[in-house]
């Protein structure tokens, strides 16, 4: 987080009003219109209204309190992947409704409405790209699509991405954010836990690196499978990470849980994650970890008699 005023920019609504007073008065209607048009973003933690352009420049981390606001998959890819290196995978895969599930509405209708609203086919985007020049396979979950729930398409896309990474000998990074398995797909969604885990085991057997990044929230079947299978497990500050929800656990145990229960900081203290990395440092941290695990180039194998011959020649 920047400390000097120059880098902080228009950090709050008070700064904006101060600037407007200097540049001349504006109507209240215009001010309200600019807020409604998305020029401002209200921090869900401290309530400060920040200029959206400045907030995006700080990767949606509140300049006032450091709260990590939720970001969509498009923004996350822009933050991590080098320009003009992103190659999406399996964009043609679409979810279906094999169980003809219905709760308050048909699952097929819910899918169509969500797809039309946010422009995504399902809750994950996968692809190949580069981080600081290093090739990786990246999966990014999107909480806007039915709470980032894991259905058949999410499982299939992640599995195919991991298999491609194994074939190409790429490290895998998955940005996790999910409420868990998608109940509308029943057992089919639960099967994705085993399928993704099996693909990750083959990736591990090939001695390749896998780093999950746990963001707010990461819960349910995602936590119980691929989110916790990394060689190095990273988390964002204050992220909620767990299996069952806090309210469910409190009702089951009939006792109040600690305030920091199921937070990234609590999991770090108990050894369930390896490090907590602020979003503004995530790209460089991933690049450093991937670079450390790149295969070391060794000279071609040389038989003993050739070594002896070279040694004796040098001595002469």
UniProtKB/Swiss-Prot annotation:
Binds 1 zinc ion per subunit. It comes from the Bacteria. GO terms for cellular component: acetyl-CoA carboxylase complex. It is an enzyme of class 2 (transferase). A zinc finger (C4-type) spans 43-65. The keyword tRNA processing does not apply. Zn(2+) binds at residues 43, 46, 62, 65. One of its GO terms (molecular function) is carboxyl- or carbamoyltransferase activity. PROSITE patterns: COA_CT_NTER (PS50980). Coiled coil: none annotated. Its cofactor is Zn(2+). Keywords: ATP-binding, Cytoplasm, Fatty acid biosynthesis, Fatty acid metabolism, Lipid biosynthesis, Lipid metabolism, Metal-binding, Nucleotide-binding, Transferase, Zinc, Zinc-finger. Its EC number is 2.1.3.15. It catalyses: N(6)-carboxybiotinyl-L-lysyl-[protein] + acetyl-CoA = N(6)-biotinyl-L-lysyl-[protein] + malonyl-CoA. It is found in: Cytoplasm. InterPro entries: AcCoA_carboxyl_beta (IPR034733), Acetyl_CoA_COase_Trfase_b_su (IPR000438), ClpP/crotonase-like_dom_sf (IPR029045), COA_CT_N (IPR011762), Znf-ACC (IPR041010). Residues 39-308 form the CoA carboxyltransferase N-terminal domain. GO terms for biological process: fatty acid biosynthetic process; malonyl-CoA biosynthetic process. Pathway: Lipid metabolism; malonyl-CoA biosynthesis; malonyl-CoA from acetyl-CoA: step 1/1. Acetyl-CoA carboxylase is a heterohexamer composed of biotin carboxyl carrier protein (AccB), biotin carboxylase (AccC) and two subunits each of ACCase subunit alpha (AccA) and ACCase subunit beta (AccD). Belongs to the AccD/PCCB family. Component of the acetyl coenzyme A carboxylase (ACC) complex. Biotin carboxylase (BC) catalyzes the carboxylation of biotin on its carrier protein (BCCP) and then the CO(2) group is transferred by the transcarboxylase to acetyl-CoA to form malonyl-CoA. This is Acetyl-coenzyme A carboxylase carboxyl transferase subunit beta. It comes from Nostoc punctiforme (strain ATCC 29133 / PCC 73102).
